[in-house]
Amino acid sequence: MKRTQNKYDLVVVGGGHAGIEAALIAHKRGVKTLLVSMDKKSVGRTSCNPAVGGLAKGQMVKEVDVLGGIMGFFADLSTLQSKTLNKSKGRSVWSPRSQIDKKLYEKIAQKYIKEQGLDVLEGEVVSLNIKKDSICGVFLKDGSEVVCSAAVLTCGTFLNGLIHIGSKQINAGRYGEKSCLLYTSPSPRDNTLSRMPSSA
């Protein structure tokens, strides 16, 4: 098994909104950080509905902004249309929302990450190296290991993602992209990471 030359303080798994925020804020604070994504070209790619804002997400974007995050900045630079939702109701439920250009948002995010000097590695993390209840590294699908002191998992909907077409189930993320099959130990049977059960 080959190991990376560099030891990182933090490895962030996944290059969506959460992964970018976690990696950039750690990097800005002087933490030696590596962002791992299954596809470098998909870092910053948004979901099917490329909207930033709304009642719940809008509040979150503002809080991320206050804490030094970057999502709102990327959204401002890639906005196609802005609108205040619920104008016919009381002010307490008014909420700004922007429809963004998906491709432009992605391009801006990748350019900014490069300018900041954040290390990005293309690969798929399949398990965590845990010794004495501490993370020592992450194992990639190609058999290599990235040594680190901590890891943040931001796999989102890609973590063990399934697409249902009729009675068929396919492991997948967004259309045309594969899902992330991540385990907490080298043996998939030992302790599979999965989504939390929905409370019905």
Where are the model-predicted features located?
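Beta1/beta-strand and adjacent pyrophosphate-binding region of the FAD-binding site
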Residues: 6-16
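Conserved beta-strand-loop-beta-strand element in the redox core of flavoprotein oxidoreductases
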Residues: 130-144
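Single conserved hydrophobic/aromatic residue that forms the stacking wall/gate
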Residues: 183, 190-200
